[in-house]
Swiss-Prot record:
Similarity annotation: Belongs to the histone H1/H5 family. HCT subfamily.
Name of the protein in its database record: Histone H1-like protein HC2
Domain of life: Bacteria
Entry function: Might have a role in establishing the nucleoid structure of elementary bodies.
Gene encoding the protein: hctB
Entry-linked Pfam families: HC2
Alphabetical UniProt keywords: DNA-binding, Repeat
Coiled coil: none
Keyword Ribosomal protein: no
Transmembrane segments: none
GO biological process: chromosome condensation
Length: 207
């Protein structure tokens, strides 16, 4: 260590006592009850006002106007002298002799005679039936499950499906796998996805 080590003082510091602070005593101020001053009521003397006597109203005397009966003047009737017009004697009508209508002759109705067309008997020719040749049931081709069986056919692509004319053209060009939309040999319940197709193509191309 550089220098002289500082000598520690031998004085012992008095152990500090933890000062406990006492909370200041709260002084509760004595509440003075507020005294309400009651205002002294002044008795006001009411003056009695003398009521004035209202003079009784006299009903106004109704004037009854004397109604005069209207006198109707009767117009003097003028007597008009009527002239008697001489009546003209009407000539007696002559009764016209009725012409006797000639008795109508009832034309004898002729019953229309219908001509019955003579039926021609047409001789039907019996058409000789051609004997239909019995169809032979087409021999079912047994599809081999081996993978090499498809590739064995000449001029057919490597794809496992029902081959079409497009497959033959592709195989002739030297390509192993065609891109035809021929029907794949799969079960009708199976659903194919794009991923499964890609995986299968990769396997076929790898061969």
């Amino acid at each position: 260590m550089l220098g002289v080590q500082k000598k520690r003082s031998t004085r012992k510091t008095a152990a500090r006592k933890t000062v406990v602070r006492k909370p200041a005593a709260k002084k509760t101020a004595a509440k003075k009850a507020s005294v309400r001053k009651v205002a002294a009521k002044k008795t006001v003397a009411r003056k009695t006002v003398a009521k004035k006597a209202v003079a009784a109203r006299k009903p106004a005397a109704k004037k009854t106007a004397a109604k005069k009966a209207p006198v109707r003047k009767v117009a003097a009737k003028k007597t008009v002298a009527r002239k008697t017009v001489a009546k003209k004697a009407v000539a007696a009508r002559k009764t016209v002799a009725k012409k006797s209508v000639a008795a109508r002759k009832t034309a004898a109705k002729k019953a229309p005679v219908r001509k019955v067309a003579a039926k021609k008997t047409v001789a039907r020719k019996t058409v000789a039936k051609k004997a239909v040749a019995a169809r032979k049931p087409a021999a079912k081709r047994t599809v081999s499950t081996k993978k090499t069986a498809v590739a064995a056919k000449a001029g057919v692509c490597m794809k496992k499906h029902k081959h079409t004319a497009a497959c033959g053209r592709v195989a002739a060009s030297g390509v192993k796998v065609c891109a035809s939309s021929a029907k794949r040999r799969t079960h009708h319940n199976r659903s194919r996805t794009a991923h499964s197709w890609r995986q299968q193509l990769m396997k076929l191309v790898a061969k």
